[in-house]
Swiss-Prot record:
Entry's Gene Ontology BP terms: attachment of spindle microtubules to kinetochore; cell division; chromosome segregation; establishment of mitotic sister chromatid cohesion; meiotic cell cycle
Subunit-level organization: Component of the heterotrimeric kinetochore subcomplex CTF3, which consists of CTF3, MCM16 and MCM22. The CTF3 subcomplex is part of a larger constitutive centromere-associated network (CCAN) (also known as central kinetochore CTF19 complex in yeast), which is composed of at least AME1, CHL4, CNN1, CTF3, CTF19, IML3, MCM16, MCM21, MCM22, MHF1, MHF2, MIF2, NKP1, NKP2, OKP1 and WIP1. Interacts with CTF19.
Keyword annotations of the record: Cell cycle, Cell division, Centromere, Chromosome, Kinetochore, Meiosis, Mitosis, Nucleus
Identification of the protein by name: Inner kinetochore subunit MCM22
Compartment annotation: Nucleus; Chromosome, Centromere, Kinetochore
Keyword Cell cycle: yes
GO cellular component terms attached to this protein's record: kinetochore; nucleus
Top-level taxonomy: Eukaryota, Fungi, Dikarya, Ascomycota, Saccharomycotina
Function: Component of the kinetochore, a multiprotein complex that assembles on centromeric DNA and attaches chromosomes to spindle microtubules, mediating chromosome segregation and sister chromatid segregation during meiosis and mitosis. Component of the inner kinetochore constitutive centromere-associated network (CCAN), which serves as a structural platform for outer kinetochore assembly.
Additional record remark: Present with 1026 molecules/cell in log phase SD medium.
CDD domains documented for this protein: MCM22_CTD (cd22646)
Family as reported in the entry's similarity comment: Belongs to the CENP-K/MCM22 family.
Length: 239
C-alpha cells in the first residue's frame, strides 16, 4: 500500500513539474511574440532578411517529451469518466426488465394501427368532400333537422292551412293539428289511422293521397280500420 502511495506521489509531483514547465514555456513564447511584434512595428518599412527567416523555420519550435505525463493524465481522466458513465448506463439498462423485442413489436403494431387509422380518416375525408354542399350556416344534423321542421311549419301556417280554415277555428290551432298529423306520418307512426283525420284535416289526407305519397292499408285484425303510412321515397317513384 505504501509502495502504491509512493508511486502516486511521484506521479503527481512529476505532473506538477510538467505543468509548471509548460506555463514557463508559454510565458516565454508569449514574451517573444510580443517582442517580435514590437520590433516589427519599430522597423516598419525595412525589408525582412529571408535567409534568417528560412533558417529559423528549419529548427523545430517545440520538442514534446516522450513520456508526456500531462497527455497521459488527460487521456486517463477522459477514459475513466467514459468508463464510469458507460457502467452507469449499462447498470440502468440491466435494471429494466422490459423485453426489447416486445417493445419493438408493440411499436410496430402501434405504427401499423396509426397508419390504418390515418388511411381510413383520409378516405372518410374524401367521401365527405365529395358530398359536401354549400350549407355553411348548418353546423349539425340536429340543426338541419330543426330547420326542416321549421320550414314545414312555416309552409303549413303560411300556405296550406289558410286554405283549410273555415273561420270556425284559428289558424294556429289548425296548424298545430295538421303539424301533429304530418309529424306522425314522417316519424312512421304505425298507429296512425284514417280516423285520426278530423273533418277539418281530411282535406290534407285527400291531398296526400292524390299526390301518391301515402298508402292506405286495411287492418288485418280489424278490417274496418285503415292505417295511413308514408311511402318509402327511396324505393317509390312519384311520377
Amino acid at each position: 500500500m505504501d509502495v502504491e502511495k509512493d508511486v502516486l506521489d511521484v506521479y503527481i509531483k512529476n505532473l506538477e513539474n510538467q505543468i509548471g514547465n509548460k506555463r514557463y514555456f508559454l510565458k516565454q513564447a508569449q514574451g517573444a511574440i510580443d517582442e517580435i511584434t514590437k520590433r516589427s512595428l519599430d522597423t516598419e518599412g525595412k525589408p525582412v532578411n529571408s535567409e534568417v527567416f528560412t533558417e529559423l523555420l528549419r529548427k523545430p519550435m517545440f520538442f514534446s517529451e516522450r513520456a508526456d505525463p500531462i497527455g497521459f493524465s488527460l487521456t486517463s481522466n477522459f477514459l475513466s469518466l467514459r468508463a464510469q458513465s458507460s457502467s452507469e448506463w449499462l447498470s440502468l439498462m440491466n435494471d429494466q426488465s422490459v423485453d426489447q423485442k416486445a417493445m419493438l413489436l408493440l411499436q410496430n403494431n402501434i405504427n401499423s394501427d396509426l397508419k390504418e387509422l390515418l388511411r381510413k380518416l383520409q378516405h372518410q375525408m374524401t367521401i365527405m368532400d365529395s358530398k359536401k354542399q354549400d350549407h355553411a350556416h348548418i353546423r349539425t344534423r340536429k340543426a338541419r333537422n330543426k330547420e326542416l321542421w321549421d320550414s314545414l311549419a312555416d309552409f303549413l301556417k303560411g300556405y296550406l292551412v289558410p286554405n283549410l280554415d273555415d273561420n270556425d277555428e284559428s289558424i294556429d290551432s289548425l296548424t298545430n293539428e295538421v303539424m301533429l298529423l304530418m309529424k306522425r306520418l314522417i316519424e312512421h307512426d304505425l298507429n296512425l289511422t284514417l280516423n285520426d283525420f278530423s273533418s277539418k284535416t281530411i282535406p290534407i289526407y285527400r291531398l296526400l293521397l292524390r299526390a301518391n305519397i301515402i298508402t292506405v292499408i286495411e287492418g288485418s285484425t280489424n278490417p274496418g280500420t285503415k292505417y295511413i303510412k308514408l311511402i318509402d321515397f327511396n324505393e317509390t317513384s312519384l311520377t
